[in-house]
Structures are given as structure tokens and as C-alpha cells.
């Protein structure tokens, strides 16, 4: 068992953070705010594609994932709950964004490429609100996740944060 995450998983992890922050800071109706909207949709779709790649890469490197020993069984349950909630949101938020966009316009050009949209008769306003709510909740959860990593590093002084950092020995 290694004490660091494999490099491809580290790259996906930190690239996802960058893209989520980009998606969050460019949030808004992409059919109104054209330039930032394009960045929003690009970052959001990239998060979704990276999520799919992440699942494949993690299953390939299954045996090389560090076993950061939990301090108690409650901590392990909490870690797994946060992990699977993050996973679900990485999937759900972009999909809801895409459904909302499909209801707001009949065609959408992303860097001159026509994005495939679905025709639907759902209440786009509500789906848009849910997308926004989950987007905001996601940032709060990431904040807790990051805080936990920092507490591990500075208070418990263990290997958890270092296991996701390339440079730190
Ligand atoms: C991790 C990915 C994403 C995050 C964190 C995110 C977050 C957000 C947030 C917070 C808003 C509300 C902004 C505001 O009104 O102040 C928003 C709006 C919106 N997003 Fe996303 N988004 C993501 C991905 C996507 C994707 C992939 C699409 C489309 C393919 C999309 C389409 C939209 C649309 C259409 C709105 C406007 C909703 C409305 O006005 O009702 N988003 N997004
Ligand atoms: C978009 C933001 C983030 C997402 C979606 C995210 C998601 C995840 C996920 C799902 C894992 C479990 C490993 C895996 O399946 O890849 C993980 C592990 C980890 N993350 Fe994040 N993370 C984010 C941001 C951060 C930040 C800002 C920090 C630190 C400041 C951080 C530190 C860590 C550490 C140290 C681990 C290893 C935990 C362990 O194995 O015990 N993450 N992250």
C-alpha cells in the first residue's frame, strides 16, 4: 500500500478544484451573460467529463490508493459520506445545469460548437433553482472537506493532506 495517491488521481483532484471554482465564479444564465456563460458551461462540462475519467482511473489504480487510517469508525463513516456526496454532486450539478440550459434555449454554441441539448417540458425555473442551490451547497461541502484536510495536517499532523500533494515528502 502506497502513502500517496497515484499522480493521475492527484491531477484530476486538483484540476477538478480549479474547474469547480471557475464554474462557480462564472455562474449565471449563460444565454444572458454570453462570455462568462460560455466559461461556465465549459468548466461545468469539463467537471462532468473529469468525473467519468476519475471513476475509470480510480478503478484502474484501486490497489495503489493510500489507506489513510481513520482515527475512529465515526470518522471513517463521515469520510465516506462526504466522499460519496462529493461524487454525487460532481455528476448531478452539471446534468441539472445542462437540463436547465436545454429549457432556456433551443441551441447553444460553446466555442462555435453546437452543444447537444434535450427537448423537455419540465419546469426549468425549479430545476435551475435546484442547480443553483446544489452549486452553493457544493462549495460549502468543499470548504468542510478542505478544512478537514488542513486539520489533519496541522492538528493531527498525519499523512492525509500529504497523500494528495505531489511535492510534500
Ligand atoms: C460543477 C459545475 C457547476 C457549478 C458549480 C454550477 C453552479 C451554478 C450556480 C451557483 C449558478 C447560479 C448563479 C447565479 O445565478 O448567481 C448556476 C447557474 C446556471 N448554470 Fe451552472 N454550474 C455548474 C455546471 C453547469 C453546466 C455544465 C451547465 C450547462 C451545461 C450549467 C448551466 C447553468 C445555467 C443554465 C444556469 C442559470 C440557471 C437559471 O438562471 O435558472 N451549469 N450554475
Ligand atoms: C472541487 C473540490 C474538491 C473535490 C470535488 C474533492 C473531492 C475529493 C474526493 C472525492 C476525494 C477522495 C479520493 C478520490 O476519490 O479522488 C478527495 C480526497 C482528498 N482531498 Fe479533496 N476535493 C476537493 C478539494 C479539496 C481541497 C481544497 C483540499 C485541501 C485543501 C482537498 C484535500 C483532499 C485530501 C487531503 C484528500 C485525501 C483524503 C484521504 O484519502 O483521506 N480536497 N477529495
Q: Where are these predicted regions, by residue range?
A:
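Membrane-embedded alpha-helical bundles that constitute the cytochrome b-like, heme-associated redox core
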Residues: 1-169
Amino acid at each position: 500500500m502506497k502513502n500517496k495517491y497515484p499522480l493521475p488521481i492527484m491531477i484530476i483532484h486538483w484540476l477538478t478544484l480549479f474547474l469547480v471554482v471557475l464554474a462557480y465564479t462564472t455562474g449565471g444564465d449563460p444565454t444572458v451573460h454570453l462570455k462568462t456563460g460560455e466559461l461556465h458551461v465549459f468548466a461545468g462540462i469539463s467537471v462532468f467529463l473529469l468525473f467519468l475519467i476519475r471513476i475509470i482511473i480510480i478503478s484502474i489504480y484501486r490497489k495503489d490508493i493510500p489507506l489513510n487510517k481513520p482515527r475512529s469508525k465515526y470518522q471513517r463513516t463521515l469520510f465516506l459520506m462526504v466522499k460519496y456526496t462529493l461524487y454525487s454532486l460532481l455528476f448531478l450539478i452539471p446534468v441539472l445545469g445542462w437540463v436547465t440550459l436545454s429549457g432556456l434555449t433551443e441551441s447553444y454554441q460553446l466555442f462555435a460548437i453546437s452543444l447537444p441539448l434535450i427537448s423537455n417540458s419540465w419546469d426549468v425555473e425549479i430545476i435551475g433553482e435546484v442547480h443553483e442551490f446544489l452549486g452553493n451547497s457544493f462549495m460549502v461541502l468543499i470548504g468542510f472537506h478542505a478544512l478537514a484536510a488542513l486539520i489533519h495536517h496541522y492538528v493531527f499532523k498525519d499523512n492525509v493532506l500529504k497523500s494528495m500533494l505531489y511535492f510534500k515528502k
